[in-house]
Amino acid sequence: MACTGPSLPSAFDILGAAGQDKLLYLKHKLKTPRPGCQGQDLLHAMVLLKLGQETEARISLEALKADAVARLVARQWAGVDSTEDPEEPPDVSWAVARLYHLLAEEKLCPASLRDVAYQEAVRTLSSRDDHRLGELQDEARNRCGWDIAGDPGSIRTLQSNLGCLPPSSALPSGTRSLPRPIDGVSDWSQGCSLRSTGSPASLASNLEISQSPTMPFLSLHRSPHGPSKLCDDPQASLVPEPVPGGCQEPEEMSWPPSGEIASPPELPSSPPPGLPEVAPDATSTGLPDTPAAPETSTNYPVECTEGSAGPQSLPLPILEPVKNPCSVKDQTPLQLSVEDTTSPNTKPCPPTPTTPETSPPPPPPPPSSTPCSAHLTPSSLFPSSLESSSEQKFYNFVILHARADEHIALRVREKLEALGVPDGATFCEDFQVPGRGELSCLQDAIDHSAFIILLLTSNFDCRLSLHQVNQAMMSNLTRQGSPDCVIPFLPLESSPAQLSSDTASLLSGLVRLDEHSQIFARKVANTFKPHRLQARKAMWRKEQDTRALREQSQHLDGERMQAAALNAAYSAYLQSYLSYQAQMEQLQVAFGSHMSFGTGAPYGARMPFGGQVPLGAPPPFPTWPGCPQPPPLHAWQAGTPPPPSPQPAAFPQSLPFPQSPAFPTASPAPPQSPGLQPLIIHHAQMVQLGLNNHMWNQRGSQAPEDKTQEAE
């Protein structure tokens, strides 16, 4: 009589009911070893015993003589267990569970029997305190689900006791909490399902949230609902006010006692990785006396939002400004970040470069609006091609179809995924983006999938479908490392007679995947093998990385060309600048040799005929990597204006020509010399020279001729 529960005899009964053909198929399939498939050799020996091939079965069992379960199978088959009465090995329940897993994969037994077998194995190892229990539980979770490895007897529903909570005990050394601490669970009832009676005394309606005053809250991002009520400036009054009901989740945070400022609790040697530290000087003053909480109370992250326009729920501590808000040590054993806004009393500053030796290096801060995390990264200087390529998902297969066959494509994708081929896609659902070119969508579908499935129906005969076939075939021929990636698929809704002659001729050299076939599921398993899918995904990642690096290289080449052009422009500017300096030097020498007015202007600013030169500094020479810098100027060249250049610069205003105190008395003309001649004025009292209309008035003694004329 067949056994009802999972056991070795019941496994033999299942094999006996499978039939001769199925046993022959299992014999050849199990003969090839598969990595990570425990129990395959034992099942192969049992199949040989059921087929009557005792010689081969004896050889297989002899190879497994180190396995106690295999020796038990040999003794049971030989019929010697009744005389010797051997002790059952401890691993027999685990081996039976693995056998039932293989039988369930071959559809020879329901999955429920496999689950029962694993439950029995877990129960057996738990009763013996076997050290391999964790390994068995992991295997059971992977094969049967997460609920199979637990103990059903230990699961209880939650229960809420609406009675009075145990009174709080004030601990002198512990932290204080508002509004009421939770000391212990000794007097509590067992858990049951959550329920609410709606009474005013319900626990859920009286919960309040208190703010931890041990640190100024530095948020990485502001709350979308508005500023927090817990993070405003401290009010003049510290009297608690009623809480607006229904605006915050129940959460408890600790307040330190007033005497804890001088003696903070001991800090841990190393904070948890990735959590901010809080400085020990962030303390609170003027706190009201509240019941003390147990030492195990911990500050947890709470994102506070404004629920109503009511008054503040709790008194706020006075926060003193700290030296570095970005690196502050908390006074509680666990440092946890709280999302909130920074107090106005704190001043933002750059992060400190040093950290304690006992703490691990903190992770790089995420980009935010706070000054402490505003750092420039090298990736901001280049296009994020690698990041954009990683956003594109890789599919194990994509179904190309006609527009009228969208429902068939969705059904085929769901069926293939049900047969064990995950991450499938259809052309209409995953790649046809509205507004994008049809050919670009087709190319994306081909580039980001391991296998291309052509849905052969009577509608698959238009020009667009033929183009899809041609593109898929060319991709099959040209893509390296991806042979045999095009699969013609004949669904249940179609037949070979309904296909067009063009499509049939193009795909005549490829083997079809026919859904009408009786071994369709087996063909799917042989086609979409996991190692083939993993290899093609690895090849796809290499292609995406290569493409991203190529785009970055092109971007860098463009920037390099721009830098070379700018360098050439600056070199031309430098040449013109040096030429201008040489010309100005010649002009200054020529003008200086012919100056005759004893004005107080500098030598470099004096010109004949009342002319003037601006005395401003030359424009700053722009810097660029690899561009030569201009030579230093002499003191007399400080007022020279630059020549026209590729980039014009603003020049300072010219200074007025200095005024002479008195015009010199006219004298006989000196001997003329070739070149520029000085200006000589006779018989004039008022003289106006230059562009600034300065007047010189000479009222000294008159010439003898003038005196003679006046006497007459």
Swiss-Prot record:
InterPro entries documented for this protein: RHIM, TCAM1/2, TICAM1, TIR_dom, Toll_tir_struct_dom_sf, TRIF_N
Ranges of biased composition (kind: Low complexity): 650-666
Chain positions of site (Microbial infection) Cleavage by CV3B: I148
Site-annotated residues for (Microbial infection) Cleavage: Q159, S160, Q190, Q312, S313, C372, S373, Q554, Q653, S654
Ranges for domain TIR: 393-553
Effect of Q190R: No cleavage by HAV 3CD
Subcellular location: Cytoplasmic vesicle, Autophagosome; Cytoplasm, Cytosol; Mitochondrion
Motif residue range(s): TRAF6-binding: 84-91, 248-255, 299-309
Tagged with keyword Mitochondrion: yes
Post-translational events: Phosphorylated by TBK1. Following activation, phosphorylated by TBK1 at Ser-210 in the pLxIS motif. The phosphorylated pLxIS motif constitutes an IRF3-binding motif, leading to recruitment of the transcription factor IRF3 to induce type-I interferons and other cytokines. Polyubiquitinated at Lys-229 by TRIM38 with 'Lys-48'-linked chains, leading to proteasomal degradation. Polyubiquitinated with 'Lys-6'- and 'Lys-33'-linked chains in a TRIM8-dependent manner; ubiquitination disrupts the interaction with TBK1 and subsequent interferon production.
GO annotation terms (biological process): apoptotic signaling pathway; B cell proliferation; cellular response to lipopolysaccharide; cellular response to oxidised low-density lipoprotein particle stimulus; defense response to virus; inflammatory response; innate immune response; lipopolysaccharide-mediated signaling pathway
Primary location: cytoplasm
Sufficient to induce apoptosis: region residues: 512-712
Annotated effect of mutating T4I: Inhibition of IFNB induction
Cross-link Glycyl lysine isopeptide (Lys-Gly) (interchain with G-Cter in ubiquitin), where in sequence: K229
Phenotype for T377I: No effect on IFNB induction
Functional summary from the UniProt entry: Involved in innate immunity against invading pathogens. Adapter used by TLR3, TLR4 (through TICAM2) and TLR5 to mediate NF-kappa-B and interferon-regulatory factor (IRF) activation, and to induce apoptosis. Ligand binding to these receptors results in TRIF recruitment through its TIR domain. Distinct protein-interaction motifs allow recruitment of the effector proteins TBK1, TRAF6 and RIPK1, which in turn, lead to the activation of transcription factors IRF3 and IRF7, NF-kappa-B and FADD respectively.
Domain notes from UniProt: The pLxIS motif constitutes an IRF3-binding motif: following phosphorylation by TBK1, the phosphorylated pLxIS motif of TICAM1 recruits IRF3. IRF3 is then phosphorylated and activated by TBK1 to induce type-I interferons and other cytokines.
Disorder: Encephalopathy, acute, infection-induced, 6, herpes-specific: A rare complication of human herpesvirus 1 (HHV-1) infection, occurring in only a small minority of HHV-1 infected individuals. It is characterized by hemorrhagic necrosis of parts of the temporal and frontal lobes. Onset is over several days and involves fever, headache, seizures, stupor, and often coma, frequently with a fatal outcome.
Protein's UniProt name: TIR domain-containing adapter molecule 1
Organism: Homo sapiens
